[in-house]
Amino acid sequence: METGKSDVLDKIEKINKKDSALQEIIPKGYEIEHHQCGIALNQLIPSKKEGEPDKKVFITSTIPQITERFEDIESNEVSFNMLFYDNKTPVNIAVSAEEISDSRQLLKLVNKKLDVTSSTSTKLVDYINASKRYNPPLNVKVATRLGHVKGYFIYPYQEVMKDSNVKLFSNDKGFQKLIDSFRSKGTLQGYSKKVFAQIKDLPMVMVMLYASLGSVLLREFGLQPFIVEISGSTSTGKTFTLNLVSSVWGTSDLITTWSSTQNSIESMASFLNSFPMFKDDTRNTHPKFVTSATYNFSSGESKSRSNINLTLNAKKEWRNILISTGESSIANMADEKAGVSARVVTLQDQPYPDNFDFTTLDKSFRENYGTLGLAFIKQYESKKDVYKNAFESYQRYFNQKGSNEIMQRLGRAFALLQVTGEVLNDIDGFEHDHFKIIEQAYDSMVKNNKTIDKPKQLLEEILQYLDANRNNIVGDGYSSVKNGDIKAIYKRDYLCILGETVKEKLTHELQTITGQWDKKGYLIKGEKDRLQKQVKHQTVKYRGFAIRQEVLKELGFDFSNSYNPNSNY
């Protein structure tokens, strides 16, 4: 495994400047031999006869030294940095304890330039461990992921972590690419004047910016992960916005597409941990995958999986925000719409005004990035108790404001976004009306997102189905059903949707949804306060859910047959 370009290598670079193979103490029974082609490590086998020289057995021409011992502060697992020289060029490899203890594992490092064969691997393992005892490696505490880890906050920025007792360590090339994308250019003042000033009055864009910044606060306020998405038709600036809001932490290389596997999303969420995950364009994968990934991500932990030892792997955990784009909202992709809706803040209004200058703003945030995120964390730390009290106040406000169960469950998410806006507003040069921003975004979501009120949405869907199948309706003004079953009975004061029709549409959610219909006052109930009403038609008694006429009108439906010239209705 190759070490990543993380800050832990700072200490290694000091050793790289020296010929460590000559500096270290060579264990008894070994020697380093210099020759015209380089150097060689030999094992010395004492002669059995007096006067005969000791026998030399060649081991390797790339003499390894274990320079660092890395101890993961979460798992307590130990790994090492192995240093050797290949044609006078230093090579650092991150190796597990198993790889330097098992000759078969060590042999795999031949692909990393280590001079080892099947006949020398056992001897080389013995030398490495003997050398490690003679030359104890430097102990380094490391974290293998970002954000809140065991009482530390692990930054992806090398300059911030240089004085920390814990170093960031990654030997995964994919994660290393993410680490490299967390970098800065320009100044905070430049970002304020050239980027923030252009977007501070755009509610949809600002809420996405709040989500990007506020992700690092989820553990601070005890929130589960959630999703913030901007959805709508093409060419409205969705991907542009994602690039923009990622700039508070680094470059647009932080963004990946939805064309991923469940495992890769879990791994990335766990690695980023507290920092936001950016996913572009839900069209890149199947809707069922998106909804499944949404449920899994918002749980904050990976699925339980067994291993070859028939035990369970340790679960990966995270507390961050997933920021997404797509033409269709994630909630609309789901069969269980209410469950998804309570996990997703959906922004559907036009994010930018007509004739907006995208070109200038694009140039600005590509020349100024990676500064605001650090300033945000610093500002939060300076008044942490004040912001925590503000969060509690905002949470109470949104709980009271929530007009239904979904918006009440999203109240904590909006409270976090609101306090994020407050922290941002307290940074010099980033003053703006954060209350107005959140208020507009909240009201927009209530207005545009029909999946928020699931009972109402499902009733609308059933009514649309009946409207398209009026030949299966009987009652006042209707003729008899000639083909198929009766699905509803129309009366002047209500439309009675037969129980079987509702059961067919609502399946296992029948009791929950019809109970909500009752609470909302949609139903004319039957005898003994039963939800289903008995309705008589042509001497036959039917049972069903009687939807009030005023509710039908409110939802835009007219099931009267007044358009029929032969009808009195």
Indicate where each model-derived feature is located:
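Conserved glycine-centered beta->alpha loop in an early N-terminal alpha/beta scaffold
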Residues: 2-199, 267-268, 272-275
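DNA transaction DNA-binding modules
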Residues: 140-198, 386-569
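AAA+/P-loop NTPase substrate/partner-engagement loops
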Residues: 241-290
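A short beta-strand-to-loop transition that corresponds to the Sensor-1 phosphate-sensing loop
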Residues: 281, 319-329, 348-350
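Conserved catalytic/switch belt of AAA+ P-loop NTPases
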Residues: 291-305
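AAA+/SF3 P-loop NTPase mechanochemical coupling elements
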Residues: 307-324, 340
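Phosphate-sensing "switch" segment of ASCE/P-loop ATPases
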Residues: 316-318, 334-427
